[in-house]
Amino acid sequence: MKRRRFIKIAGLAASAFGLGGIDTAMAADSNVQPDLSHSPQGSAPAQPFVPAFDQARFERKLADFEPSFYSVRVGRKNDDKGIGYGWYDRLKILHISDTHQYNALVQEAVTLAQGRCDVICNTGDDGNGSEKVGRERSLEWLEKASNAVRSTNASNVPYLAVKGNHDVCNITRSDYRRAIGSLVEGYATSVVWGSPDAMFGHYDIKINDSMGTIRFLMLDPFDYEDGQFPAVRSFMTCTFSQAQIDWLVATLRDAAEKGCKVITMMHYSFGDNSIEFSEAEAKPDAESYQDPFLVPDIIDALQHGTALKKLYRDSRGIQDIRVNITPSASRLEYICHLFGHIHSKNQYRCRKSDGSKDYDMLMLGEAALGAYGNALNKAYRYPNSVNDIACSVLEVDTVEKCIYRVSYGSFMPYDGSPVSRITKIPYRMQ
């Protein structure tokens, strides 16, 4: 499909994001007030952080968006939430994923975040590695992606990143840590790694007393010792080490005891209702997983303060995992999981496909524009859909227990269902 034709199709999705200007659908909440210092006319309806743009002009360029941003501040009277009078800011996250060498998009997205977002989260696949691509080429792609961030992150917005399956092929864990770990350390200076050469770690952001501290956990589903597996196998296999799971349990328990809210980020999502797990089941020679409920079970136990003692057998014979969590009076407040991989904007809750359990875990998947068209996005996983998303801004409100999500680009669900330009998503089931 030629690009011009695609843009015409993408125009069908214009109602999903609004045409030219700020959507006013959420102005009814009198408790939400805009910061008018960034408003072009000095007054506007209350809105989450949204730039005005003209969908008809969209050609994969975030630079087309007019710089009209709102720094939302919310005021509430004394109520059962106990926050008192005053204002508080939401945490603003720029989420990008699966850019696959399209570094112009990386630069535009990082530029968008300057002075507007509190953190940038990249959920992997900066490169386009495969078993046919050598180590030097893979490292070159990671270096170019890193340079794209460094060249545009002038205000030093904290930057967090995790491995994608196309990043790790034919390179070692040490290679990736040197290439991307140093980039993360340069902007998220207080990041705490799980071990000296690991790419799993956590980073805390305290917004204010009302919002509290949010702890970001970067997870590594390609956690192999250098030389442990052939490079091609690391491309195909999702595997946690016992050391990472022990770290995860300890770090989540510490968050619960300190009252930190938690966001996890990884290239893949969780649960056997996820698209990527279904694909792995359908073609086990292409992708393979440990138990898809290993991490959800851990989070669930710490959310409810219950015990979990279990041996998670790995049917592939790669890495069995032991979990031993004792009961606790502390309760983990879990916000969401950020992921990529499937080249599709998604939101759903982790659950067992047989209906036996629903986890209180919100999954938020990010898409990306293709540098060479949109072949994967438009047809591979969701026929009859348009999924040309550049990035999303997520406003996390820990008082309302919700996330305001705004995506930049064109999106039309495969079933033709309407999509709000601003999506308000509760992150707790109850």
Feature names for model-found ranges:
Residues A63, P67, G75-R76, R135-A250, ...:
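Extended active-site neighborhood of metal-dependent phosphoesterases/phosphodiesterases
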Residues H38-S68, G373-Q430:
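A short C-terminal boundary segment appended to hydrolase-like catalytic domains
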Residues D80-H95, Q114-V119, P158-L160, D197-Y289:
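Metal-dependent phosphoester/phosphodiester hydrolase catalytic core
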Residues M1-I7, Q33:
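Twin-arginine (Tat) signal peptide motif
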Residues E279-E400:
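Conserved beta-sheet core of the metallophosphoesterase superfamily
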Residues Y102-A104, N128-S130, K163-I171, Y224-G227, ...:
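Active-site environment of divalent metal-dependent phosphoester hydrolases
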Residues R5-A27:
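N-terminal export signals
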Residues P34-L139:
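N-terminal active-site segment of His-dependent metallophosphoesterases
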